[in-house]
Amino acid sequence: KETGDYDILKEQVDYKNDPALAQPLLDHLKRSFYHVVNNKGPHGLPLIGRADWNDCLNLNCFSRVPGESFQNTASNIAKEVNPETGAPLNEETAESVMIAGMFTYIGPEYVELCRRMGDNAEADKAQAEIDKMKEAIVKYGWDGEWFLRAYDAYGKKVGSNENNEGKIFIEPQGFCVMSDVGGKEFTEKTMASIDKYLGTEHGLVLNNPAFTRYIVEYGEISTYPGGYKENAGIFCHNNAWIMCAAAYAGMGDTAFDYYTRIAPAYQEDEKLHRTEPYVYAQMIAGKDAKRFGEAKNSWLTGTAAWNFVAISQYILGIIPDYDGLKIDPSIPKAWDGYSVSRYFRGATFNIKIENPDHVSKGIKSVTVDGKAIDGNVIKGITSGTHEVVAVMG
C-alpha cells in the first residue's frame, strides 16, 4: 500500500533461514493464513497454543510448581484430567477469540492481494474461510455485550460475564469491531462495554475485574497483583487497537479521547506518571493498583508504532491504500479542521482538512491543486508537491 510495488510479493524469502527452502513472499503469507485455518478447536475458533499476543494467558500450561516456566505446555497438560469427562486434557481445546478477530481483520488483505495478483480462485477460497470464522465468532465468541477472550483447556469461557473475575478482556474487542463481526449491533454494544468496564482516566485496563488469586488453568496472568501488567493493568499497546476501532466506527470523539489518555505529552502530573514525556510506557498501573496512573517499563513496547497508526491513519485519516492515498478522517466533532503534510510514492501532499459541518466522519469533496477528484483516493501522482483540500460532511 505504501509503495504500490507488487513485485515484493514475488521476492524469494527463506524458510528456516535456508536459501534452499526459499519461496515467494506471497507463499509465506498464504502459509500464515492457512496455519490459522488448519489449527482450529471445537468451536471452529483458532487454537491458542502456548499463547497468543498475551504471552501471560497460558491456557495450556498448568504450572503447579513455583519457579516453573509457564511455557511447559506439552509436559504439564498431559497430566491434567477433565473432571467432567475423566479424559486427559490436550492442546486441541483452548481457543483464542483474539486470534479469530485478528484473522477476520487482516485476512481480507490477503484476499485483496490474491485478486491483484490474478489469483481469483485463491481469493474466493480465502474469503470463504474468513466468512466461516466470522460465523464462528458470532455463534461462539459473543457474550451478549462484548466478545469472549477465549475458551480454556476445559472448554470453558474466558472473558465472559459467567466468570467471577476477568469477565471482559480488551484484546479481541477492537479487532472484532474492525472486522464488522455482528454488524452495527455488536459494535455499539462492544464499544459501550469497553468504556463502561475497561475505561479509566489513565487509559483502558486489559481486563476487569482483576484476578485476586492464582488460577492454574489461566497461568501467569493471574500471578500479578491487581492493576499491574497483564492483570488489569493499562497495557498501552492494546489501547491503540480500541482507538482504531472507535475511529473505524465513526466515533471520532471517543477515539481521540482514548488517544489523549495514554499519550505521554498529555500527562500533566509528572509526579504520578513518572515517565519521560516523549516516550510511551509498556503499561500504566490500573485502577486496582496502589499507584493508579504510574507508568512503567518505558521504551519496552510496541505502543509507539500502533499509536502512530491510530492517530495518523485512523483518526487523522491519511491512509496509504492500494490505489493511492486515501483521505478518511474520524475526528472530534468540535474540530474545525487541520493540516497534514504527507510524502507518498514520490510526491508530497500538503493536505488541508476542513470540517464546516462539525462531523466526525465523512468526506464531501476532495480537490488536488484546485481540481476536484472522484471519491477520496488520490491516484496516479508520483512526483512534485501538491495542495489538497478535503471537505468533511
Go through the PLM ranges and name each one.
Residues 196-200, 212, 225-231, 244-393:
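Non-catalytic C-terminal accessory modules of carbohydrate-active enzymes
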Residues 84-100, 156-179, 221-239, 244, ...:
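Solvent-exposed loop and edge beta-strand segments that line ligand/cofactor-binding
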Residues 2-97, 121, 125-154, 191-218, ...:
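Active-site acid/base region of carbohydrate-active enzymes
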Residues 2, 115-116, 179-182, 245-248:
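Alpha-helix C-terminal capping/termination sites
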Residues 103-104, 111, 123, 130:
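Heptad-repeat amphipathic alpha-helical coiled-coil interaction surface used
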Residues 7, 106-116:
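Juxtamembrane interface elements at the cytosolic ends of transmembrane helices
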Residues 1-49, 96-100, 104, 187, ...:
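Aromatic-rich carbohydrate-recognition surfaces in CAZymes
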Residues 150-164, 223, 343-354:
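Flexible, glycine/threonine-enriched loop-and-boundary segments that flank and lead into catalytic domains
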